[in-house]
């Protein structure tokens, strides 16, 4: 007998309700870092990037500028959930990029664990949201707006087993890079079920008949954004190093071997992780991953009916 599975529309509605339930039961998130009065007073160059004009703020060192929460793709919500990232929507006027964005939707982390202690500051824990496709840029003040500066660029991909993490974790000090003449870009990308769900209903919607890996497509979209826009910050689009740790390192390995990234990456740094780690199943294939996705959605639907 032919198996039935949820349509993509019902899939979306089921997960939307599950997300709302999770938001209600998790603790309130801390407010993301706000720009200080001093950083607002210091003038920052207004830059033209994909989508419109942006301004930033000073770092703790006034010789460093930070452009926080720059959107690199449209919000992956509603009809764009479980779709490849779409072009960012243009805005009017100047967007003030002086606060970090929400992180990708994920479970609450254990702050007493090694990962919680080493990588996260509970006082600056950002909010969680599906609207998470943003990046951050640290650059020397003298380079911002100077397209001839040609500084080297590093794009950092955070770890977290593809289930947790965000672009401004405390282990990555953007000011330290910028003070040494290197522009640092850190990114958010979709995680867990929002970034890597495979399901027959989703596979049926695209010409490749495949689903999943939306988080990796987010990373590629961010990389393309960097190539197209980093000169505005004083960076060299032909000298981009992609770096990552743990799941971020596995992501780097995937990007450097993907034909979609051909010509975009100059160098790579792979820290504590690779393409084939213990958390990567060597037996994973389309049928098994879609079956796992169907099982998860069936469980969500049953819990909703109780």
What feature does the model see in each segment?
Residues 233-245:
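Alpha/beta-hydrolase fold nucleophile elbow
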Residues 2-18:
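Bacterial N-terminal signal peptides that target proteins for export
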Residues 2, 32-213, 237:
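Non-catalytic accessory segments of hydrolases
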Residues 93-123, 204, 208-212, 217, ...:
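Mature extracellular catalytic domain of secreted serine hydrolases
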Residues 17-28:
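Bacterial N-terminal signal peptides
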Residues 226:
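A glycine-rich beta-to-alpha transition motif near the start of alpha/beta enzyme domains, typified by
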């Amino acid at each position: 007998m032919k198996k039935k599975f949820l349509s993509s529309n019902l899939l979306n509605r089921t997960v939307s309700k599950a997300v709302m339930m999770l938001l209600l039961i998790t603790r309130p998130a801390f407010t993301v870092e706000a720009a200080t009065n001093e950083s607002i007073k210091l003038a920052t160059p207004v830059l033209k990037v994909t989508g419109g004009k942006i301004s930033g703020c000073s770092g703790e060192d006034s010789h460093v500028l930070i452009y926080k929460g720059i959107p690199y793709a449209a919000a992956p919500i509603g009809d764009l959930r479980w779709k490849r990232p779409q072009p960012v929507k243009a805005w009017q006027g100047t967007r003030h990029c002086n606060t970090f964005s929400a992180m990708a939707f994920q479970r609450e982390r254990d702050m007493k664990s090694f990962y919680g202690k080493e990588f996260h500051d509970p006082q600056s824990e950002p909010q969680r949201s599906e609207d998470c496709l943003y990046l951050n840029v640290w650059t020397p003040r003298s380079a911002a707006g100077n397209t001839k500066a040609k500084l080297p660029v590093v794009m950092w991909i955070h770890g977290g087993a593809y289930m947790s993490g965000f672009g401004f974790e405390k282990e990555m000090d953007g000011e330290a890079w910028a003070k040494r003449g290197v522009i640092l870009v850190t990114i958010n990308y979709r995680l867990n079920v929002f970034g890597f769900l495979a399901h027959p209903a989703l596979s049926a919607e695209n010409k490749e008949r495949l689903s999943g890996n939306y988080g990796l497509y987010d990373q590629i979209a961010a990389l393309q954004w960097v190539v197209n826009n980093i000169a505005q910050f004083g960076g060299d689009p032909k000298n981009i190093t992609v770096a990552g740790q743990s799941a971020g390192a596995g992501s780097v390995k995937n990007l450097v071997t993907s034909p979609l990234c051909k010509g975009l990456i100059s160098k790579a740094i792979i820290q504590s992780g690779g393409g084939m780690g213990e958390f990567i199943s060597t037996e994973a294939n389309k049928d098994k991953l879609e079956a796992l996705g169907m099982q998860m959605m069936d469980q969500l639907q049953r819990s909703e009916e109780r």
